[in-house]
A protein has these predicted regions:
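Active-site metal-binding loops of divalent metal-dependent hydrolases
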Residues: 48-52, 69, 74-76, 105-106, ...
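Binuclear metal-dependent hydrolase catalytic cores centered on His/Asp/Glu-rich metal-binding motifs
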Residues: 117-124, 136-172, 178-180, 235
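N-terminal membrane-anchoring alpha-helices
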Residues: 1-38
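Short, conserved loop/helix-junction motifs that constitute active-site signature segments
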Residues: 64-65, 90-96, 161-164, 182-185, ...
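Beta-strand-turn-beta hairpins that frame and shape the catalytic cleft
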Residues: 29-45, 124, 131-144, 164, ...
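Conserved beta-sheet core of the metallophosphoesterase superfamily
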Residues: 175-249
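Structural motif
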Residues: 44, 68-69, 140, 167-169, ...
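Membrane-embedded segments
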Residues: 40-127
Length: 249
């Protein structure tokens, strides 16, 4: 009886550890109404909550080499993650496409100025409550905010002159910021992470909502389970994931 219980527990823990280390690349499609009958396409690679994980060659091989933009949805790192690990991860992601990054609630534990220097070294852009045009897609802009834990979220600044774009990708680490934005602006695509999908779920039940992608009349919203873990390197019912969103417009 004891041996059976022990074997069962160890099997579950092994399953949870394996789930946390998976390199799942989840693919989504978003069709945006266009007078030109969808003659343009943009591919967005989105990854959030990397924490202590490596962006390695095995993951890179799974990602389409024609992605147009890489968006890191916060929690690139946390306390105890080496600067060399952070630098390597950004270097590897920057081989795919231009990198845009938003702060998560744990990132500054690894050193704010150090992260800024790494981003600058690889030509990556930090979205500090601001917006920029997306290279190769001049009618599209990307906007992002700081993390709410800093009390420096400025949605108004992040959307300043936003009407210069026909379409906007809006990213913030925490989903609650997306809900605030929706009260007075409707981006074409919204992205967030932070929740880890609850990380450990029993059936439908978890401490936080499981990640999902929703579309509605040419607009999309993605809340990711995230790629890494916090506290314990285990997952159940909310597997590690990153995303490629193919937008036809």
């Amino acid at each position: 009886m004891f041996r059976t219980a022990f074997f069962l527990i160890m099997s579950i823990i092994t399953l949870m550890f394996t789930s946390a280390k998976r390199r799942n690349v989840v693919r989504h499609k978003l069709n945006v109404p266009s007078p030109n009958s969808h003659n343009a396409r943009m591919k967005v690679f989105f990854i959030s909550d990397i924490h202590r994980r490596k962006i390695d060659r095995k993951l890179l091989k799974k990602i389409d080499m024609d992605v147009d933009i890489v968006i890191i949805g916060g929690d690139l790192a946390e306390r105890g993650v080496s600067l060399s690990r952070i630098s390597t991860n950004i270097r590897n992601l920057s081989t795919l496409a231009p990198v845009y990054y938003i702060w998560g609630n744990n990132d500054r534990e690894a050193g704010e100025q150090e992260i800024r220097l790494i981003m600058s070294r690889y030509g990556s852009v930090i979205l500090d409550n601001e917006n920029f045009p997306i290279p190769g897609h001049p009618t599209w802009g990307i906007s992002g905010t700081d993390d709410p834990t800093t009390e420096r979220v400025d949605i108004g600044a992040s959307l300043q002159n936003i009407n210069q774009y026909n379409h906007v990708i809006f990213a913030s680490h925490q989903p609650r910021v997306l809900r605030e934005v929706e009260c007075f602006y409707r981006p074409t695509l919204m992205l967030a992470g932070h929740t880890h999908g609850g990380q450990i779920r029993i059936g439908k039940f978890g401490l936080l909502e499981k990640g999902k992608f929703q579309t509605n009349f040419g607009r999309g919203k993605l809340i990711s389970n995230g790629y890494g873990t916090s506290t314990v390197p285990l997952r159940l019912g909310a597997p590690a994931e990153c995303h490629i969103i193919t937008i036809d417009y």
